[in-house]
């Protein structure tokens, strides 16, 4: 009988949920969902100095925001330390591990000598078969795996293919430190085994760990999970991803105004492909996802592509849902509290009314919020530098005439105000643009905005006439 698929996402809570971690979680989640399995979440919090509760909260919140739901309770690695020690003692009792009493100075000398001789194996195995009675009385030993001295360790990786290590180049890795704390290598293997993990999908920076971890599996007689080491994400120039490229936490993308669906869609295409298809619903991702379609080359992060995709998702979203997303965004941006204080039933209704024009221009929710600023602006409006340049004495006089022409418009709609302004322009011998731009500056404080007649309709008669009066000569 085939075992049900179980994947896991196992971040270390030493900071935010990195964008690469978000993609790893997504790949694990998609694969499990495709095959009707489970994705588990394990917090690898054994580094007690660097692991923090805020970092754990950021990881959980980031996954939820991305729409990645894990199955069952979250597993905390540190809480399982007794089980990890139990396995180390089992290996010791079976003669597959040994106590090492090498001092820090001796280990440093071994490493220096190995490096000088160009050897990758840094520990010389001096305590491998040595009589423990020779150990210093006050020395707390580490426990090391008695790794095979010859032959090969082989991983049949679903992404990288067949990967082979010569055992003569691999150290007897430490399982338990001198203070009795388990190492990462041991903890990961024990946890994956006990959690019935069938597939380990993680970054290819863990590939060397796979060789060492397989040796622990072999020593315990446990079945090795299927391994899939996915390529890392690089910057557009092919260099290691940095903050200027986009090496940020998922929370930063949230604050920059990216939609979770857009970020999910973008991340799934980093390193994985399905023909020429670029845009996927969540169900389409689940149906199409396959480990065999993940490439070996590092994926390149492209902000412009992400922005374009995000713009597509904004345009496809219904207006009310975008207002809800904007309200959520207010918790994460500096200007959020001030705008939140201005949110009323009236301004929410104005946002919904303005949204068809707003969303055509915006690539992020931040841009959407910025372009909607005219709705929340206090009178008299702050006019930006470009707008100030427009407001010459002659233009201010024109604004007064435009206000007069609009006073009797009824009903007040985009169509009726446009008709009034076209009539005014014709009678004054002006092009419509010469009328629209002064209106735009007077009503929004800027030289760019959604369609000016949409702005007139959204703000309503009283507010428009008041704003025009503020700027008229």
Swiss-Prot record:
GO cellular component: cytosol
Cystine crosslinks: none
Xref: PROSITE patterns: AA_TRNA_LIGASE_I
Job description of the protein: Catalyzes the attachment of glutamate to tRNA(Glu) in a two-step reaction: glutamate is first activated by ATP to form Glu-AMP and then transferred to the acceptor end of tRNA(Glu).
Quaternary context: Monomer.
Membership in a protein family: Belongs to the class-I aminoacyl-tRNA synthetase family. Glutamate--tRNA ligase type 1 subfamily.
Protein name (record): Glutamate--tRNA ligase
Lineage start: Bacteria, Pseudomonadati, Pseudomonadota, Alphaproteobacteria, Hyphomicrobiales
């Amino acid at each position: 009988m085939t075992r049900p698929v179980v994947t896991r996402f196992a971040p270390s809570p030493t900071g935010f949920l990195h964008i690469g971690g978000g993609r790893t979680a997504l790949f694990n989640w998609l694969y499990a969902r495709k095959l009707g399995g489970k994705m588990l979440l394990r917090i690898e919090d054994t580094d007690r100095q660097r692991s923090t509760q805020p970092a754990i909260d950021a990881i959980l919140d980031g996954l939820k925001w991305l729409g990645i739901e894990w199955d069952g309770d979250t597993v905390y690695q540190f809480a399982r330390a007794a089980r990890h020690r139990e396995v180390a003692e089992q290996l010791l009792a079976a003669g597959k591990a040994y106590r090492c009493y090498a001092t820090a100075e001796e280990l440093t000398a071994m490493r220096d000598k190995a490096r000088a001789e160009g050897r990758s194996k840094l520990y010389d195995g001096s305590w491998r078969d040595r009589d423990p009675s020779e150990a210093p009385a006050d020395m707390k030993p580490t426990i090391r795996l008695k790794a095979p001295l010859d032959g090969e360790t082989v991983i049949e990786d679903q992404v990288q293919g067949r990967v082979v290590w010569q055992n003569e180049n691999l150290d007897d890795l430490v399982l338990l430190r001198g203070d009795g704390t388990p190492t990462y290598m041991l903890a990961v293997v024990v946890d994956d085994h006990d959690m019935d993990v069938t597939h380990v999908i993680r970054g290819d920076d863990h590939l060397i760990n796979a060789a060492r971890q397989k040796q622990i599996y072999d020593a315990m007689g446990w079945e090795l999970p299927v391994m899939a080491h996915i390529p890392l994400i690089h910057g557009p120039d092919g260099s290691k991803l940095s903050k200027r490229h986009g090496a940020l936490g998922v929370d930063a993308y949230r604050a920059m105004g990216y939609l979770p669906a857009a970020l999910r869609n973008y991340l799934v295409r980093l390193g994985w492909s399905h023909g020429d298809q670029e845009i996927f619903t969540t169900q389409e991702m689940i149906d199409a996802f396959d480990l065999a379609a993940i490439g070996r080359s590092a994926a390149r992060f492209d902000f412009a592509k992400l922005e374009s995709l995000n713009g597509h998702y904004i345009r496809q979203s219904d207006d009310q849902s975008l207002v809800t997303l904007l309200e959520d965004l207010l918790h994460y941006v500096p200007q959020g509290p001030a705008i939140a204080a201005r949110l009323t039933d009236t301004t929410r209704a104005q946002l919904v009314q303005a949204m068809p024009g707003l969303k055509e221009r915006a690539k992020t929710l931040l841009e959407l919020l910025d372009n909607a600023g005219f709705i929340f602006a206090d009178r008299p409006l702050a006019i930006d530098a470009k707008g100030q340049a427009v407001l010459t004495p002659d233009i201010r006089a024109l604004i007064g005439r435009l206000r007069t022409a609009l006073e009797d418009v009824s009903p007040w709609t985009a169509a009726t105000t446009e008709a009034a302004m076209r009539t005014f322009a014709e009678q004054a011998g002006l092009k419509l643009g010469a009328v629209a731009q002064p209106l735009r500056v007077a009503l929004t404080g800027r030289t760019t905005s959604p369609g000016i007649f949409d702005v007139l309709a959204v703000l309503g008669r009283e507010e428009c006439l008041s704003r025009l009066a503020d700027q008229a000569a």
